[in-house]
């Protein structure tokens, strides 16, 4: 299989020697994106088996940032809450927006080899965006709170606040479903495929489908 022999790789990320902590709000989309990338690089390069929990605004896609870290042999896991749009007048083109989101998480599932776990929920859009800094990234060392339009962010290393958000996140997971599951067991994969297809269809297995 030619595809199986392809070596996927990326240039290593730059070094970040310290957390960019500040008591002030971070303003401007460029500054917000920059501090998010710096925090992620710092955490996975200074800690082992890092666990990251996050709930991101639709505008923020971290596919490249995480693939960059995973493909350079950094060991960490990510759990993400995904908001999927309902079919309603409040959410224009919900199917297209949900497919776009799916297209960004599939590469993460493959690059992470099972270390990326996306959980999804559907809810009223206004309820989701009822707070100015409702989105967040939780790491071992800090909490990043992010506005929906990426214009503003706040970073905190308060351990009590980090613990509070982490417990809140775990509570939310109990009401969400795992969107994609990865398995290295070929029999589990085949069984899942067969169970999801019609019993009277013909199954054909090829080395290069």
Name the predicted role of every residue range.
Residues 104-111, 134-148, 168-183:
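A short, terminal or domain-edge coil/loop segment
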Residues 118-161:
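HKD (HxKxxxxD) catalytic microenvironment of the phospholipase D
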């Amino acid at each position: 299989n030619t595809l199986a022999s392809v070596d996927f790789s990326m240039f290593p990320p730059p070094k970040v020697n310290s957390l960019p902590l500040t008591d002030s709000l971070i303003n401007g989309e460029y500054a917000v994106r920059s501090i998010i990338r710096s925090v992620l690089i710092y955490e996975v390069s200074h800690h082992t088996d890092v666990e990251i929990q996050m709930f991101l605004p639709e505008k923020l896609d971290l596919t490249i940032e995480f693939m960059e870290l995973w493909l350079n042999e950094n060991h960490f896991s990510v759990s993400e809450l995904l908001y999927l749009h309902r079919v309603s007048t409040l959410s224009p083109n919900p199917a297209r927006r949900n497919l776009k989101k799916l297209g960004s998480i599939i590469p993460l599932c493959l690059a992470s080899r099972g270390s990326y776990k996306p959980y999804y929920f559907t809810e009223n859009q206004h309820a989701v965006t009822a707070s100015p800094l409702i989105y967040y990234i939780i790491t071992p060392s800090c909490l990043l709170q992010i506005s929906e339009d990426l214009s503003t962010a706040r970073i905190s290393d308060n351990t009590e606040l980090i613990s509070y958000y982490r417990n809140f996140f775990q509570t939310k997971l109990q009401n969400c479903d795992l969107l994609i599951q990865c398995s290295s067991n070929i029999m589990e994969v085949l069984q899942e495929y067969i169970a999801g297809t019609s019993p009277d269809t013909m199954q054909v297995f090829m080395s290069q489908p």
